[in-house]
């Protein structure tokens, strides 16, 4: 099966809000803790080995990377790789810059269609994961959680992690969050959940071009 995300390439790097590209194409943001496997997940979703890079020093990369998707001459969307968060040794000034950059981007970017939130399946819904959800909540846009590294769990542990995450997301629904909140298990190493994630992301950015000929299917 051919997926639109497989036509991805580096576009630009942004370190300040004023440098965000003015392009009107829809965007999907990828967020997650520094050790949640975000870069690896982006690479496997785009069927490339070195599209997204993880910093050698976790938490030190404080800029936003853009990857254009679709034909090179006429891209149809952008994937937006946000800085990883949660690394204890990040200096205070860098952390403040990160918080300002991410929170403002997530809350005000009109091109943004939704957020893919990466969580380590062994430690889902940390305090900082919840902060990301709460930053994004006022927009009413969808959040889809990838519970990464699920290959490190037993089948029952995976079931429990997914159930606990969905229960946690239900709390935001009960509190009045208007956007769609979904979650799935994911493993870049074992290629678990790839088709499900592909179809959902492409349903956000280009429903008519999604890889499933019968239309994209959203995760539960």
UniProtKB/Swiss-Prot annotation:
<dbReference type="GO" id="GO:0005525">
    <property type="term" value="F:GTP binding"/>
</dbReference>
<dbReference type="InterPro" id="IPR027417">
    <property type="entry name" value="P-loop_NTPase"/>
</dbReference>
<keyword id="KW-0131">Cell cycle</keyword>
<feature type="binding site">
    <location>
        <begin position="32"/>
        <end position="39"/>
    </location>
    <ligand>
        <name>GTP</name>
    </ligand>
</feature>
<dbReference type="GO" id="GO:0000917">
    <property type="term" value="P:division septum assembly"/>
</dbReference>
<feature type="binding site">
    <location>
        <begin position="59"/>
        <end position="63"/>
    </location>
    <ligand>
        <name>GTP</name>
    </ligand>
</feature>
<feature type="binding site">
    <location>
        <begin position="81"/>
        <end position="84"/>
    </location>
    <ligand>
        <name>GTP</name>
    </ligand>
</feature>
<keyword id="KW-0547">Nucleotide-binding</keyword>
<feature type="binding site">
    <location>
        <begin position="185"/>
        <end position="188"/>
    </location>
    <ligand>
        <name>GTP</name>
    </ligand>
</feature>
<keyword id="KW-0342">GTP-binding</keyword>
<feature type="binding site">
    <location>
        <position position="39"/>
    </location>
    <ligand>
        <name>Mg(2+)</name>
    </ligand>
</feature>
<dbReference type="Pfam" id="PF01926">
    <property type="entry name" value="MMR_HSR1"/>
</dbReference>
<dbReference type="InterPro" id="IPR006073">
    <property type="entry name" value="GTP-bd"/>
</dbReference>
<keyword id="KW-0717">Septation</keyword>
<dbReference type="InterPro" id="IPR030393">
    <property type="entry name" value="G_ENGB_dom"/>
</dbReference>
<keyword id="KW-0132">Cell division</keyword>
<keyword id="KW-0479">Metal-binding</keyword>
<feature type="binding site">
    <location>
        <position position="61"/>
    </location>
    <ligand>
        <name>Mg(2+)</name>
    </ligand>
</feature>
<comment type="function">
    <text>Necessary for normal cell division and for the maintenance of normal septation.</text>
</comment>
<dbReference type="InterPro" id="IPR019987">
    <property type="entry name" value="GTP-bd_ribosome_bio_YsxC"/>
</dbReference>
<protein>
    <recommendedName>
        <fullName>Probable GTP-binding protein EngB</fullName>
    </recommendedName>
</protein>
<dbReference type="GO" id="GO:0046872">
    <property type="term" value="F:metal ion binding"/>
</dbReference>
<comment type="similarity">
    <text>Belongs to the TRAFAC class TrmE-Era-EngA-EngB-Septin-like GTPase superfamily. EngB GTPase family.</text>
</comment>
<feature type="binding site">
    <location>
        <begin position="148"/>
        <end position="151"/>
    </location>
    <ligand>
        <name>GTP</name>
    </ligand>
</feature>
<feature type="domain" description="EngB-type G">
    <location>
        <begin position="24"/>
        <end position="207"/>
    </location>
</feature>
<keyword id="KW-0460">Magnesium</keyword>
<dbReference type="GO" id="GO:0005829">
    <property type="term" value="C:cytosol"/>
</dbReference>
């Amino acid at each position: 099966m051919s997926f639109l995300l497989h036509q991805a390439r580096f576009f630009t790097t942004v370190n300040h809000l004023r440098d965000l590209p003015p392009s009107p194409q829809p965007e999907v943001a990828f967020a997650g803790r520094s050790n949640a496997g975000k870069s690896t997940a982006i690479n496997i979703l785009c069927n490339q080995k070195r599209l997204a890079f993880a910093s050698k020093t976790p938490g030190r990369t404080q800029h936003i990377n853009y990857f254009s998707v679709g034909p090179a001459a006429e891209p149809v969307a952008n994937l937006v790789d946000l800085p990883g968060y949660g690394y204890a040794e990040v200096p205070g000034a860098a952390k403040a810059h990160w918080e300002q950059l991410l929170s403002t981007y997530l809350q005000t970017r009109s091109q943004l269609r939704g957020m893919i939130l990466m969580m380590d399946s062994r430690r889902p819904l940390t305090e900082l994961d919840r902060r990301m959800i709460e930053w994004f909540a006022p927009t009413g846009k969808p959040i889809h959680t990838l519970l990464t590294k699920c290959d490190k769990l037993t089948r029952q542990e995976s079931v429990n992690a997914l159930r606990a995450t969905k229960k946690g997301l239900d709390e935001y629904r009960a509190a009045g969050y208007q956007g769609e909140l979904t979650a799935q298990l994911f493993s870049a190493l074992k290629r678990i959940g790839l088709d499900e994630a592909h179809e959902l992301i492409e349903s956000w950015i280009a429903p008519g071009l999604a890889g499933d000929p019968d239309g994209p299917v959203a995760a539960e």
